[in-house]
Amino acid sequence: YNSPSLDDGTIAYHRVFGVVTANSYWYFSSKQLEQDIIAAENNPQISAHLLHINSPGGEAWYMDRLSETLRSAKKPIIAIYEEYCASAAYYIGCHGQKLYATTNHDFVGCIGTMCSFWNFEPYFEKLGLKKIVAKATNSSRKNKIFEDLKDGKSEDYIKNVLDPMNEQFLAEVKAMRSKLSELGD
């Protein structure tokens, strides 16, 4: 994106495929997209950004920074959705001044925040594996929020982790897609 040999009017192509992660060397990375947007913004030969999105979503980490960068972009952003543009992918795509789905069957939306994981401890115990945890004297609350979540007590995790991310996500979508702010929850 920062090559001086690009033709004037070049459109920066940004591929958002697969699961959204903050860090990845092999797949999509929201941190890398932010760097690419900044580089394209600084290249006078580039006239616009094209976000090509096919993603079911992914993690919310770093989305606030990426949203700031997309919101502050001076060059137009066009988003094309192919098959899926859901959850964290929609968080990215909602920044387009123009949004296009490739077919009437593309899945767009799924605005919300959740966490899911598998608890393999009972399976490991059947195999004879036992988890051993040692905590420093002054670290009795270390990872308590995750231990509570694993034990079916999700209230603190929802209140302190998911709800703040969800509020940020909803506020960004409503700010970028003003017609959606008129819709009910």
Please place each PLM-identified region on the residue numbering.
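Small-residue-centered hinge/linker elements
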Residues: 1-75, 84, 88-177
